[in-house]
Amino acid sequence: MTTVSSDRIRIKLKAYDYRILDKAVAEIVDTARNTGASIAGPIPLPTNIHKFTVNRSVHVDKKSREQFEMRIHKRLMDILEPTQQTVDALGKLSLPAGVDVEIKL
């Protein structure tokens, strides 16, 4: 089989919901293994937590506040020695909505 010019494909996935993220990772792993490529990962990266503090009432009662948080879960995986068939299969792959994908060749 012919290999792509680079030694690996690095895929970084981000999502607010870790269950959707894990489903997307499983689809990528199955696709890559079916085309004969080996995989390193998925490696869970640290979760970014953004916290927002808001007053509960508009004008009075400064001591009464509410906190909200937004968690961004991330995974990193490398596809080692990808073939052209692997690249084509990853390009045609349909991932769940809400998953941000960064691919570096």
Swiss-Prot record:
<dbReference type="GO" id="GO:0000049">
    <property type="term" value="F:tRNA binding"/>
</dbReference>
<dbReference type="GO" id="GO:0003735">
    <property type="term" value="F:structural constituent of ribosome"/>
</dbReference>
<dbReference type="InterPro" id="IPR001848">
    <property type="entry name" value="Ribosomal_uS10"/>
</dbReference>
<dbReference type="InterPro" id="IPR018268">
    <property type="entry name" value="Ribosomal_uS10_CS"/>
</dbReference>
<dbReference type="GO" id="GO:0006412">
    <property type="term" value="P:translation"/>
</dbReference>
<comment type="similarity">
    <text>Belongs to the universal ribosomal protein uS10 family.</text>
</comment>
<comment type="subunit">
    <text>Part of the 30S ribosomal subunit.</text>
</comment>
<keyword id="KW-0689">Ribosomal protein</keyword>
<dbReference type="GO" id="GO:0005840">
    <property type="term" value="C:ribosome"/>
</dbReference>
<protein>
    <recommendedName>
        <fullName>Small ribosomal subunit protein uS10</fullName>
    </recommendedName>
</protein>
<comment type="function">
    <text>Involved in the binding of tRNA to the ribosomes.</text>
</comment>
<dbReference type="Pfam" id="PF00338">
    <property type="entry name" value="Ribosomal_S10"/>
</dbReference>
<dbReference type="InterPro" id="IPR027486">
    <property type="entry name" value="Ribosomal_uS10_dom"/>
</dbReference>
<dbReference type="GO" id="GO:1990904">
    <property type="term" value="C:ribonucleoprotein complex"/>
</dbReference>
<keyword id="KW-0687">Ribonucleoprotein</keyword>
<dbReference type="InterPro" id="IPR036838">
    <property type="entry name" value="Ribosomal_uS10_dom_sf"/>
</dbReference>
